[in-house]
Amino acid sequence: MRRITLVLIIGFVVALVGLIALSLWLVPQDTNPAFAVATDFSRAALRGHEADAAAVLSPELAAYVAENCPDGAVTACIGGYIPDDWGDLVDVVYRRSVLQDSGRAWDIQTFASFQHGQGFSGVCIYLRAENPTPANADGWKITRWAGWVSCDVENKGLDALRTDPDAPNHAP
């Protein structure tokens, strides 16, 4: 193989990898329907928008909320996790995720920032989104949560929050 051909092939591969990396960096992750459901749910729950938050709960999680949360409200459960001295929610963003069950579920970590005291380190939230038929983009439902704690605390990472049965604020 001629040297120029080898250089062209290597250049093409490097350019292709660079293009893929650039597109992954530029495309917002919450364009994935599961990630969008997770961030939208977190925002709605933290802002007290009960109807929006409850609309994306799985039937099993909705039953858990009805039985275990004050007034059977998901926003009351989640609002109870957040100290008043953190202030108002600034925003929630997607942080990372792990694909599960052959694409029918995602274990997702979102990151919330608050007006006072929890801006830089933030609040780490774990959510599991499931969709029995992934081809249906509207079918994603929240089936579990944990966290809603400062990212400064020990064991607040995605792996700990999704696998530890004693994770803080877990449901169910």
Can you annotate each of these PLM segments?
Residues 71-95:
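Short, solvent-exposed helix-to-loop capping segments enriched in aromatics
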Residues 27-30, 62, 66:
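Alpha-helix initiation/capping motif
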Residues 62, 70-71, 117, 144:
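Residue-level signal for mature regions of secreted extracellular proteins and peptides
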Residues 2-43, 47, 55:
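Short, low-complexity N-terminal intrinsically disordered segments enriched in polar/charged residues
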